[in-house]
Amino acid sequence: MSHNDTIVAQATPPGRGGVGILRISGLKARDVAQEVLGKLPKPRYADYLPFKDVDGSALDQGIALWFPGPNSFTGEDVLELQGHGGPVILDLLLKRILTLPGVRIARPGEFSERAFLNDKLDLAQAEAIADLIDASSEQAARSALNSLQGAFSARVNHLVEALTHLRIYVEAAIDFPDEEIDFLSDGKIEAQLNGVIADLDAVRTEARQGSLLREGMKVVIAGRPNAGKSSLLNALAGREAAIVTDIAGTTRDVLREHIHIDGMPLHIIDTAGLRDASDEVERIGIERAWQEIEQADRVLFMVDGTTTDAVDPADIWPDFIARLPKNLPITVVRNKADITGETLGISEVNGHSLVRLSARTGEGVDVLRNHLKQSMGFDTNMEGGFLARRRHLQALAEAAEHLEQGKAQLLGAWAGELLAEELRLAQQSLSEITGEFTSDDLLGRIFSSFCIGK
């Protein structure tokens, strides 16, 4: 599909509504206005008039907005038709527009993609549009808006600019080796490099917070049957999301709940009780439980406190611990403290966190909530933050690695050429965030996840 085509799509959600909006962008948008409206509206003024069919009869009436390029969202000529939000009406109007030559249905995210290609947005800002639409909390929405307004891009561009100046200095030292002053060893380059590394570390810290806001934390509740896993899911969710009985093996499939702890999304997964099962349905549920455990950010190892006094997970169930993926964080949750009389709270046992609570009464659950928030390093007091994606974290990590490699070359061998190459690679990694250096495949993956009308 060509970017020279004129595209059209519904910009409002499908289904019935008070208002339905069709968006048209491209060279033929002017022709669409002439054919459907009978005239070209005054730029950036709301015009109330009928929307006409091929034979001149009215299909609907509403507001038309005309944004001639380059002063539009996409940078192209853009026409918006705001009519009644009935699916039949919008479908008739869409079919009418598609009868015109050179007009086609937009691909998902194509309006935002054209805005990016026409330098109306950088890539991080374009992604922020989708993140703002998908925001699951007020804090996530505010951070996504900050990204859309350029907060994240400004931080990245500052780093790129600092690297550009540093590269100029290093290249000069390489090109003029006969100067009386040895620029590579006089300490100035090292000082500037340390400054860039410190600034990058600060951006990475904020980006990790932004990623938590966007992606959340996947927590799997696992343990033996009847340990209270479903009761804990209900306590964390604040509602009866799972069936709770005294019958072992009640939960046979994976149950998912999405909650927020002070703005941080938490994806809680309740799993079937782990045991050697002869029942085929239960056996499948247990296999699914292990699949979820292997993909978790943290596992809550649920223990029935009435069955054992052990607190070390290796003593409680060594086979379970042995099967866990290496380096997967676990929190031991000793349940039924209301029966055992154990002191509620959190402690450390052989490097593992141990929480004592009662899922049935809810006592101690707030301690667990706070522990989950702290274990992910989530800071609820960070103001003016931005949202970040996993690809952003990866790009920042790659840039940091190149800078550390460059510093090692500088201090170890005064190797200016190798330092210059590491600085170039770091700059390239950062530029991938804003799209100044990005492959077509990556662009395709990013924009294909957008809404059709975006």
Swiss-Prot record:
Source organism of the structure: Salmonella paratyphi B (strain ATCC BAA-1250 / SPB7)
Record-level GO BP terms: tRNA methylation; tRNA wobble uridine modification
Subcellular location: Cytoplasm
Pfam assignment, any one: TrmE_N
Binding site for (6S)-5-formyl-5,6,7,8-tetrahydrofolate: R23, E80, K120, K454
Protein family (similarity comment): Belongs to the TRAFAC class TrmE-Era-EngA-EngB-Septin-like GTPase superfamily. TrmE GTPase family.
PROSITE patterns: G_TRME
Sequence positions that bind GTP: 226-231, 245-251, 270-273, 335-338, 358-360
Record's function text: Exhibits a very high intrinsic GTPase hydrolysis rate. Involved in the addition of a carboxymethylaminomethyl (cmnm) group at the wobble position (U34) of certain tRNAs, forming tRNA-cmnm(5)s(2)U34.
Cofactor(s) for this UniProt protein: K(+)
UniProt keyword list: Cytoplasm, GTP-binding, Hydrolase, Magnesium, Metal-binding, Nucleotide-binding, Potassium, tRNA processing
Coarse class of the protein's main subcellular location: cytoplasm
Protein name: tRNA modification GTPase MnmE
SUBUNIT field: Homodimer. Heterotetramer of two MnmE and two MnmG subunits.
Binding site for K(+): N226, T245, I247, T250
Cofactor note: Binds 1 potassium ion per subunit.
